[in-house]
């Protein structure tokens, strides 16, 4: 029997459902697909390129808005064309990694062209705004304050940036509270110790006198990833953990200081593959950054980085688009057991009520958080439909963030944004102030751009999952500010001194100047 089908808009579909809502069963929770968990990881290069394009588009929209406010034409046509192509590559077989080889040859080549175009758009806006001086300035494109040290053209500079701002860099006298010895690196926050395999065997949180490592962190492991017919690129065998993994072999290691960071450098190998790794402690930084350069030449293997925190919980908090979700770390029922690999965007966090550890990343999305383990899936090597999938060179960064506060009261969200949005440094001088500020830390101004009407759009969301009343301050002159839907329709008046957000609610402001 084939039911009658009627084409309609999503709005009319849901309006019809509302009339009969009492007749339908109700389910609260995530509709987890018990298939295709490999798509969180397969074809890592296309996933990284997608992330970089999204980041550059975000930066371009904001900086072009700043230039637009000073009289420069906003590049609507160019940005729209790039957005459409980036969204095309988010098609359900391209971005997930389940297309044929030709698709990735073509789209990865196109990504490079798109990134070059976006960098040109950004640089043109910056050039329009800046003054020509014999100095340097940094630009911060996220809704968080940032401070620290940056290296540019061989010189070190100090910066202190408000959200969505730019400021002059000052030449810096580098700090001296960094130390290292054999198998040890240390800053004012942490003392990190390594074993003879290159794994982290101790992370001492100096402020809380607490070692958050149970057995090891940064365990670089190779797991069997057998062909699940016919969905090799799509699926991971649920029983893969029953096969004992192999550790990548540590070949060389050293410790040293570079400017404001103390670094442990590891070189690993396995068969024809190799990994160069830098574990970095930076002055005043509350997290440990791990940069990875992989030459990957395996078949039906997974490269995963495993961590066993001393603190664990029945729940893991996972970053998703415009919010977060709790998932189970248990395996004692069919639903929880089936969720052996879970997706997350910028981080996953396990907090036991007293202490927590987050694993953050800049382009990796597959995680296993079960039985005391946090495992980041870094690379796969399927043979169908692309027999060369993921073979080659890869660069990615992950981070370890130990914390004693609750996740949403800690710096977790900020660090996720910092890791995924590096500073840009330019010659000259430029002083940009944020056009809007919010007095509540769990309201994030996510996007600033110019809409098709020529008005400034400010999109923000609630990130902690709680009802919030916030004051939003405008730092520019305006004729009117309206709250609208995402299509800039159904405009209503808004009280900027008392904006009410539902948990994870997205709000859009339209500013007419």
Language-model region placement:
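Catalytic-core region of carbohydrate-active enzymes that cleave or remodel glycosidic bonds
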Residues: 1-27, 52, 64, 68-78, ...
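C-terminal (or distal) subdomains of carbohydrate-active enzymes
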Residues: 4-6, 127-513
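Conserved, mostly hydrophobic/aromatic
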Residues: 9, 86, 398
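Conserved aromatic-histidine-acidic binding/catalytic patches
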Residues: 44, 48-51, 74, 99, ...
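Histidine-centered catalytic/metal-binding microenvironments
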Residues: 57-163, 447-448, 453
